[in-house]
Amino acid sequence: MSTISAALVMQLRERTGAGMMECKKFLIATNGDIEQAIIEMRKAGQAKADKKADRVAAEGIIVIARSSDERTAVMLEINSETDFVARDENFTNFANAVADIALTSLPKNIEDLSNQALSSGATVEQARQELVAKIGENIKLRRLEKMHCDGVIGYYLHGSRIGVMVALKNGSEALAKDIAMHVAASKPMVVSRDQVPAEAIENEREIFTAQAKESGKPQEIIDKMIDGRINKFIDEVSLLGQPYVKDPNIKVGQLLKEKNAEVISFVRYEVGEGIEKKEDNFVEEVMAQVRT
């Protein structure tokens, strides 16, 4: 059995809100696998919430550029170390220039994009390095998404921290933008029910099964409870099954059917999702600056 460190116990406690002894017990049972420990704690009703999993720590902006015919678009996440720099005009100008060149060149990946030439003659990478030297913070081109369709692409930016692109068939740009706004707010996993990963469904089924057995109800009732909760879960994570944010009385799928439109695909970015950023002690930070 692997040694369970105090730091790992604290990490699980911070993510779940459970007691220290409970966290240690589940980490021992899962040989230190924190993700499996969270699943087991949910089954046992011990995990209050995975508090830390969705925490966005890194700074930066999302930028989108779209062609004039509304059929091609690109979306980028560009990171900085602080929100202050993310709002800096030099940083935002750089980000928008990179998005424009990405739309023009449609690079294969970030590395390819970094080698593209901007209107100034400098490559994206050279311009990035110059900006780092000027601003004094590390700047990173984190990810790039390209989208093309024969219909129309709508997009929505919530400030500069959340960006969504939606490819729509047989619909208007206004409808595509409304759907993009919905995706920004409701965070669906997939477009339709049949696209929900089998692994995700099975994980939820295991959790629901463990929870339902605690009810003491007959097995046939438990089976119905589990099926009902699985169906609810699938609706919650699929775009077409979600209540439409602008009119919760109808689902997105119903809205699209009324408009004779179809969502081909969507992409949602949120600044820093999945990144952990070191949380500095403010006093120590000031003292460090005084000492330098």
UniProtKB/Swiss-Prot annotation:
- The domain of life for this entry's organism is Bacteria
Instruction: Give the main localization category.
Output: cytoplasm
Where, per UniProt, does this protein localize? Answer: Cytoplasm
Which region ranges are annotated with the description Involved in Mg(2+) ion dislocation from EF-Tu? 82-85
- Entry's Pfam families? EF_TS
Disulphide bond pairs: none
Q: Does the keyword Protein biosynthesis apply?
A: yes
Q: Which UniProt keywords apply?
A: Cytoplasm, Elongation factor, Protein biosynthesis
One cellular-component annotation, GO: cytoplasm
User: SUPFAM superfamilies, from UniProt?
Assistant: Elongation factor Ts (EF-Ts), dimerisation domain, UBA-like
Alphabetized GO MF terms: translation elongation factor activity
InterPro entries named among the record's database cross-references: EF-Ts_dimer_sf, Transl_elong_EFTs/EF1B, Transl_elong_EFTs/EF1B_dimer, Transl_elong_Ts_CS, UBA-like_sf
Q: Which family, according to the similarity comment?
A: Belongs to the EF-Ts family.
- Role, per record: Associates with the EF-Tu.GDP complex and induces the exchange of GDP to GTP. It remains bound to the aminoacyl-tRNA.EF-Tu.GTP complex up to the GTP hydrolysis stage on the ribosome.
- UniProt-recorded name of the protein: Elongation factor Ts
* Organism annotation: Legionella pneumophila (strain Lens)
What gene, per UniProt, encodes this protein? tsf
